[in-house]
Amino acid sequence: MTDTAMLPESWRGVLGDELQQPYFKELTEFVEEERARGPVYPPREEVFAALAATPYERVKVLVLGQDPYHGEGQGHGLCFSVRPGVKTPPSLRNIYKEMKEELGTPIPDNGYLMPWAEQGVLLLNAVLTVRSGEANSHKGKGWEKFTDAVIRAVADRPDPAVFVLWGNYAQKKLPLIDEERHVVVKGAHPSPLSAKKFFGSRPFTQINEAVAEQGHTPIDWTIPNLG
């Protein structure tokens, strides 16, 4: 089964045209060739996991990441998130530290962010696959065009949303978003390289204030312990 067959129904209506584009055919062939050569993450059935977890009509917040974790068993298709039982990565640890300082939420024993996705937080990486052990190895192969279409699809809905763009890479996507209609929360990336500027930026308060103003229930950022 090809990765495209996994595209969730709620997104198929707005992204179906992308699947017919020549670039997407080339991208699919590239990923299949990569899988034939060695491990590619996430597994085929989780490439579109972020879209499956947060249906198109339920997106309140879109958080943009860069590319998947490249270690075996780490990622599961949602940006910043790792499977239960996997050590919380540095950027996510910093996100948790900011949440604790800003909201008082306890730091959880896991990095599994599915509770956010189920509340309408689309955790989207710009690139949806990666070769084992090689960060950014599937950059520039076509995923960026596809995920730009995802961003545009959310931006083109009648309902406003909140877009979270941490770091220079994510902020390059600003031209895809009408800032008159939507709220964009910008700031430093939570990576250890830029965390000093990330800490104290209070993004979660900004997000929830905007979500409430847009007429939706604010996000409960608490991640339950799994231990």
From Swiss-Prot:
InterPro entries in the cross-refs: UDG_fam1, Ura-DNA_Glyclase_AS, Uracil-DNA_glycosylase-like, Uracil-DNA_glycosylase-like_sf
Protein name: Uracil-DNA glycosylase 2
Its job: Excises uracil residues from the DNA which can arise as a result of misincorporation of dUMP residues by DNA polymerase or due to deamination of cytosine.
CDD domains documented for this protein: UDG-F1-like
Class in the EC hierarchy, top level: hydrolase
KW ATP-binding (keyword) present: no
Annotated catalysed reactions: Hydrolyzes single-stranded DNA or mismatched double-stranded DNA and polynucleotides, releasing free uracil
Gene Ontology MF annotations: uracil DNA N-glycosylase activity
Principal localisation: cytoplasm
Entry keyword Cytoplasm: yes
Subcellular location: Cytoplasm
Family (UniProt): Belongs to the uracil-DNA glycosylase (UDG) superfamily. UNG family.
GO annotation (BP), single: base-excision repair, AP site formation via deaminated base removal
Enzyme nomenclature, EC number: 3.2.2.27
SUPFAM superfamilies: Uracil-DNA glycosylase-like
